[in-house]
């Protein structure tokens, strides 16, 4: 009782010193609205920071009650034993090659005397209990100077696909531990500008364009990014996925690849043994890099199939990582490619992961009322040393509130003390579409509830599968000697039907306490569309962008967490949050074999419409202004059926047949009684006693002749028809 009374007195007395600044328990926080881009020019950007929601929490130390400061978006990265002084960070797009500098243009501050700031506990692992780690005052408390010293700094430059960036860090709290003086900067304005010197970690753009699929990411990560900075590639580029699969699973992956192409994601297969034999991490890394650097720059996803012994993770001291395969440009930890894994030890393990993924994207209907229900799980630990000074329960409550505001209809909260495996089993079996876990973990279980791999067989949530954002130690250690927690959930099935989860992000190592909380916050904010410039619809996109925010704020520790936070499942999975609604889709029932385009009307802008032929993509387009105009990239044969597939966020997938009719330019004749030659723009056709006709790609007849024809063409694709001796031949001709 005496301890609590001292804490309250400390807060009240200290509050009066700052004239209205609050000293209280941690509050719900989002992005700091007081950080603004004042100007952005070719070689310089100005950024303004203003203090927002400064709060203090009293904690008991060897020197009595000391204060732990927090403010909106402030992050404690102070070294162990030094004063806890949060910083705030923002990323800027910078010169591709020049070194940058930061200068303070103006600042305002107030000073308060006789303030004891608590020492940092450093980076705390989730294998530990923060409450059992004492506050230890280090050597810095004997130094008569302000910490950390500079109020604005730049981190090392990084590269995110086609854009070079740099983080500007604001340190608005400066503390002299000898005089016990706290300097509070209420406003800081900085200019970040190019210098004449060559920079580090530079980038050379081989073309004046960026891949459209990353535009929203650039806008979200870089506060000064403009889409007009480069000329985007055509929007038809919906990205590309490569599935790297061991030879033994090559045939088993076909249904998955066919579906991905059918729903509009160009997907290819690469047999792992064709990359290297034996398969090594270095070989996988080099292969992904080579594919990324191919013309078009459209590689977006890589799915690894198999366990560690089939396709190894990259192992370096303290790191077991799949994510590094997607870190290609520069020497930083920002992924250019989203990485996921179907971890399997048998064909059955693989089949259930394929089945659950296809069903989730293709077969969900308006009757799937389990969507829109979520599970939040938290330990009873955490507090001042955690992200935003939140306990795990406070953290999950903030997430629960966010989900409710977005439209989730039911939130199940399982908070320690007292959570049991049955609580988790009942939540899964009752139907949930999302689970957030924040707490302790082991290779095979969650610490809160002790729900683990031995309980997975009790799950009966057949094809009612949530995806999971998991903050815990080693739940994703797929190098462990038995299937880890994440693997068990992805392989789970009951009576041959998938149970468990459709995707989970889980760590291969002991996670830090604070930094993954920031990543988890951002994942949920992206999911709930809190950032208009960063709308992501795939599991890989949501999770990786959440981790980008973690790296920006927590620097080196954030990088380590990103490298080891592993996606189990398809990184291109189109996530669902709420009960889907139907789209109104209309399209012709027939298409000419010589058509160049196919138009689809749809009442949901942003939907993806795709024509495919037995798992081969013919063309795809995004719905804009109520229609999608699909350009046909592949030739189509007449008298066949194509499949029109339309997918959309929280929509019922639409699949229709489209019959091909008319003259095909795909039937190329060889060794026939005619010759067709192209010289420049001249098409010459010769055949004795034959009728000759040329059609353009729209099926229009543009030229006719007998026996011999010379036609001056424009650039394009043409069909040449030769009718002779009672037979008709058709040949495709390209004029460039």
From Swiss-Prot:
Thiol protease. Acts synergistically with RgpA to catalyze the maturation of fimbrial subunits, such as FimA. Its proteolytic activity is a major factor in both periodontal tissue destruction and in evasion of host defense mechanisms. Disulfide bonds: none annotated. Ca(2+) 4 binds at residues 522, 525, 531. The gene is rgpB. It comes from Porphyromonas gingivalis (strain ATCC BAA-308 / W83). Ca(2+) 5 binds at residues 613, 639. It is found in: Secreted. The active site is at residues 440, 473. This is Gingipain R2. Keywords: Calcium, Hydrolase, Metal-binding, Protease, Secreted, Signal, Thiol protease, Virulence, Zymogen. Inhibited by human histatin-3 1/24 (histatin-5). It catalyses: Hydrolysis of proteins and small molecule substrates, with a preference for Arg in P1. Ca(2+) 3 binds at residues 390, 395, 521. Ca(2+) 1 binds at residues 307, 478, 487. One of its GO terms (cellular component) is extracellular region. GO terms for biological process: proteolysis. Residues 25-229 form a propeptide. Ca(2+) 2 binds at residues 329, 332, 334, 336. Gene3D superfamilies: 2.60.40.3800, 3.40.50.1460, Gingipain r, domain 1, Immunoglobulins. Belongs to the peptidase C25 family.
